[in-house]
Every structure is written in structure tokens, then in C-alpha cells.
Amino acid sequence: MSETATAYKLFRCLQCGFEYDEAIGWPDDGIEPGTRWDEIPEDWSCPDCGAAKVDFEMVEVDR
């Protein structure tokens, strides 16, 4: 498997700046570490401000 296929991504809320890291997940909402952004339900919202999932953008990070 290539590094690109396994690299985890980071998504930032455009409303408040909250960051969802696929490597960490969000256990408070039952989202296990390693959960890909596409696997999160469409009705999930930002835990900090309540913004919709569509209000997040992928952030380029060096790991």
C-alpha cells in the first residue's frame, strides 16, 4: 500500500477553526482513531460550534 493511500488528513471548521484529525478521530462522538472523513456521517457537526460537515475544509499538513 502506498504512503498516499494510508496518510491521514486533517479537516478544519471554517466557522471556528476546530480541527478533525483522521489519525486521532473524535472519541467523544464515537468516532474511532483512523476514521476517514468520508466515513463520518453527513449529519455530524462541529463539536465546538455546531457547523455542518460541509463547512470543513481539508488542511495540508506535513507529518
From Swiss-Prot:
UniProt remark on cofactor binding: Binds 1 Fe(3+) ion per subunit.
GO molecular function, one term: electron transfer activity
InterPro entries attached to this UniProt entry: Rubredoxin-like_dom, Rubredoxin_dom, Rubredoxin_ET, Rubredoxin_Fe_BS
GO biological process: alkane catabolic process
Annotated ranges, domain Rubredoxin-like: 8-59
Keywords of the record: Electron transport, Iron, Metal-binding, Transport
Keyword Electron transport in annotation: yes
The protein's required cofactors: Fe(3+)
This protein's record includes keyword Ubl conjugation: no
Gene3D superfamilies assigned: 2.20.28.10
Binding residues annotated for Fe cation, in chain numbering: C13, C16, C46, C49
Source organism, top-level taxon: Bacteria
Family: Belongs to the rubredoxin family.
Its job: Involved in the hydrocarbon hydroxylating system, which transfers electrons from NADH to rubredoxin reductase and then through rubredoxin to alkane 1 monooxygenase.
The name this protein goes by in its record: Rubredoxin-2
Organism: Rhodococcus erythropolis
UniProt gene name: rubA2
